[in-house]
Amino acid sequence: MRTFLLLFLFFPLSSYSQSENNSIYYDKNFFLIEGTIVADSLKESPYDRLPSSYKNRVRTPVWDISKSSAGLSIRFLTNTTKLKVRWEVFNDFSMNHMPDTGIKGVDLYYKNGERWQYINTGRPQGKISEYTLIENMTEEMREFKLFLPLYDGIKNIEIGIDSTSTITKALKNPKKPIVFYGTSITQGGCASRTGMVHTSIISRALDVDVANFGFSGNGRMEQPIAELISTVEPSLYVIECMPNMIKPELITERTIPLVNTIRSKNPNTPIVFIDLFKSPLTFLNTKMKSENTAMDDALKAEFDKMIEGGYENIYFIETPKLTESDHEGTVDAIHFTDLGFQRYADFLIAQFKALGLLAP
């Protein structure tokens, strides 16, 4: 009895565990975590977005939101005929304008030739969930990518495969990543599922890793985040903080210092600023329209200062005017639906190409 008890206590701590239906579950040692620029050894959890050292460097809301796994994914290869997932989240909360599948679900894609194809979504059942994503596949090696929760954090996640199958960690993408810094929209509000935030759509479309530093209500061009994202050399930085900048004076105060911090370590990397998203409310709300115009004018003024001051590889992208939209891309006149995210991703890719920011 003592021997049996010791084996029982030890087994769950290993890199894999067996379920009752003859699937074997594998942990993070068997898949590549993508969408992060911070080494696991520097984080409280491998699925965090900020280093543990930043807990006392950023405001409390920023730290709390950084525990969400927005933009993160795991990638692996397996020849299983059935693919399952079980995961545990930190909070298990819900919102009245975003589906639980986007907040705390997981999205499965597989590499079909040269493109990533959606397969299924793991629907959350609470803090701990288990879901069969696909079954009855032929037994051949395939590459899979699983996008993690946007508005909750992953405490643990495991991939379940046939007991006779193998699983292999995918190789790291050799391309330089793209880094996004922004707001609740950057974080993924309010996609219906986790793979539909624009940063992940762009990642799949360009086959490039994308780091998502979206902080709901708190994307404010702050120096600690600028310092962190400057520690890597991406292909480009995309700054879409405007919805959280509160007032024009804050834009004037923080825009150029943000660029200077990035430039101190990455003197030539392109930095792209996105103006304020055009809410359909501004069609009729004259006060909001006036305030938004003042915000955009402040950002454009800082951009012009940099260009006149000799800054290079700084870009400014104006989002489509309201007259160019059918106004059907948001859930609440602010946050994007899947339709809005797809349109925004397509728009940004076209803009990046037009500016010559993407490798041919």
PLM regions: where:
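Positively charged n-region of N-terminal signal peptides that target proteins for export
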Residues: 1-4
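N-terminal secretory targeting modules
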Residues: 6, 12-177, 353-360
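Active-site-proximal beta-strand/loop segments in catalytic clefts of secreted hydrolases
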Residues: 181-183, 213-216, 240-243, 274-277, ...
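Oxyanion-hole/transition-state-stabilizing segment in secreted/luminal serine hydrolases
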Residues: 194, 202, 219-256, 265, ...
